[in-house]
Amino acid sequence: MNNQYPFQKLPLPYGFGALEPFIDTRTMMIHHDKHYGAYVDKLNAFLETCPDLQGLSLEELIINHSSIDEIRHNAGGVFNHQFFFENLRPGISQIVIGLSGKLLQTIQRDFGSMDKLREQFSTSANGVFGSGYTWLCAYSNGRLCIVSTPNQDTPLTLGLKPILCIDVWEHAYYLKHQNERVKYIQDFWHVVDWVKVSERLG
């Protein structure tokens, strides 16, 4: 991901309209250029005043310095947005290609089936109060779990390895889905990049 200060706003790995009709073009433009871009700018502005932190990676900042609000909110915002954008792909989700081998076996072992994973993940995402994210993560022993984090908190501070996330801040879906977060979550499953999720699991 984005390596160290000064952090750059990474381009989307697809066009703004590539996730239509599930996530609309205007939402992606505002989400990427305005919201994500603002976190990059605010993180760089803070780090400009902290030379001793400028050599740290995004992950190191989050894991070691999240007690600093400017790091927790802005480094978390950069990490979470990049992670979210990168686990989406245009067109119908590559569920057959990506869900094979180790990933499929691990999901079946820890959730029983893909349908049960989706059900539990969707329930958690819909249950986030206010703003935040829901994550599929791996423990150090390789077992999978679902966690939700408020605001721009990340699973990194919990010692977990994230492999999939959904952004449930209202700016991620409100222009298209209004107050129908459930419909947004349903649409999310159509654009998950399971190949990327499999790579993250390792």
Model feature map: region roles:
Residues 1-202:
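Feature for soluble, non-membrane regions of globular proteins
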